[in-house]
Amino acid sequence: MSDILDRIIAVKREEVAAAMRSAPLEALKLEASARDLRDFVGALRAKHAAGHAAVISEIKKASPSKGVLREHFVPADIARSYAEHGAACLSVLTDEQFFQGSVRYLEEARAACTLPVLRKDFIVDAYQIMEARAMGADAILLIAAALDTPLMQDLEAYAHSLGLAVLVEVHDRNEMEQALTLKTPLLGINNRNLRTFETSIQTTLDMLDMIPSDRIVVTESGILSRTDVDTMRAANVNTFLVGEAFMRADQPGEELARMFF
């Protein structure tokens, strides 16, 4: 399979250049100043303190590897359902070309509930972080496979200066070493290889020995059943980012409750 991540990153750079021309940074700053912030990390820790799994429930219409996951796709309804059934936070895809996401989906989801929201996209430039703040995101994703360490550190510092939480995502031990240079407590381990889109939940388990106790491990991708959840919780992994399993269910929120609670 061709290197999907490289293709996505090339498109992102083109998108950023176009967006900078159409919406200057100063305009985004004005929009951002009108947005409140919700405590993303705090919401996860509150679930842990209550003895529950903390689930970042994803709103995702499609993916490059699986195609369309959900035909009947109403982000506000999905967000409300997640909130009613125990989600800690939301993750909303805003990438249009590869995941059929939208900024509008994030805005609609956030307006429909009180949960903090992660902008799920491929961040390559500080402009996208101000964009995230302006659209109402409370957290952003930084993907180690797409960024060198100095750039990742700069992007994290900028996000934190705007009050945004940062979830740094890794897939292997080298990327984990890179991620551990950041200040964020949120370490996402993607069980899906973004270069091949192959998935194994063993990826998370194999890296737990590297992680300091003050970090929050978020296992991402490939969590498809209660058995997968139990496997992770037995290894003291209590934070999950789940999309596909919920999106394929008739009632996403009910599937969340069935798998986790």
From Swiss-Prot:
GO terms for molecular function: indole-3-glycerol-phosphate synthase activity; phosphoribosylanthranilate isomerase activity. Its EC number is 4.1.1.48. Pathway: Amino-acid biosynthesis; L-tryptophan biosynthesis; L-tryptophan from chorismate: step 4/5. It catalyses: 1-(2-carboxyphenylamino)-1-deoxy-D-ribulose 5-phosphate + H(+) = (1S,2R)-1-C-(indol-3-yl)glycerol 3-phosphate + CO2 + H2O. It comes from the Bacteria. Keywords: Amino-acid biosynthesis, Aromatic amino acid biosynthesis, Decarboxylase, Lyase, Tryptophan biosynthesis. The keyword Lyase applies. PROSITE patterns: IGPS (PS00614). InterPro entries: Aldolase_TIM, Indole-3-glycerol_P_synth, Indole-3-glycerol_P_synth_dom, Indole-3-GlycerolPSynthase_CS, RibuloseP-bd_barrel. Gene3D superfamilies: Aldolase class I. GO terms for biological process: L-tryptophan biosynthetic process. The keyword DNA damage does not apply. Belongs to the TrpC family. HAMAP family: IGPS_B. PANTHER family: INDOLE-3-GLYCEROL-PHOSPHATE SYNTHASE (PTHR22854:SF2), TRYPTOPHAN BIOSYNTHESIS PROTEIN (PTHR22854). This is Indole-3-glycerol phosphate synthase. It comes from Burkholderia lata (strain ATCC 17760 / DSM 23089 / LMG 22485 / NCIMB 9086 / R18194 / 383).
